[in-house]
Regions:
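Terminal domain-initiation and capping elements
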Residues: 1-102
Length: 102
């Protein structure tokens, strides 16, 4: 005799996807890098317009630091490194860093 078979109940589980933690890219002020060069780097690496780049540069100059943008960690690290390397290549102490957004 055949016994009836019962299939286990089908359940659909949706994987929980969490948003990646975001990281801030921060421009640190120094007294040696020319303002024009900082603006050029902001335009080249962060695709800012002239006015926005100038405003960000002035904010960093007046406050000592300024948040440039917020990205996923790998993008933030890459952009901070690229911008810092542009300064190094010209002999300037221009420095960008990253930290987690709260």
């Amino acid at each position: 005799m055949n016994q009836p078979t019962t299939a286990p109940p089908r359940t659909r589980t949706e994987p929980k996807t969490e948003r990646p933690r975001l990281w801030k890219v921060i421009l640190l002020n120094d007294d040696y890098t020319p303002r024009e060069f900082v603006v050029m780097v902001l335009k080249a690496v962060f695709h800012m317009g002239e006015e926005k780049a100038y405003a960000v540069m002035l904010t960093a100059h007046r406050r000592g630091a300024c948040v440039i943008a917020v990205f996923a960690r790998d993008i933030a690290d890459t952009k901070a490194k690229e911008a810092t390397e542009l300064g190094k290549a010209k002999g300037y102490p221009l420095y960008f860093t990253t930290e987690p957004e709260e």
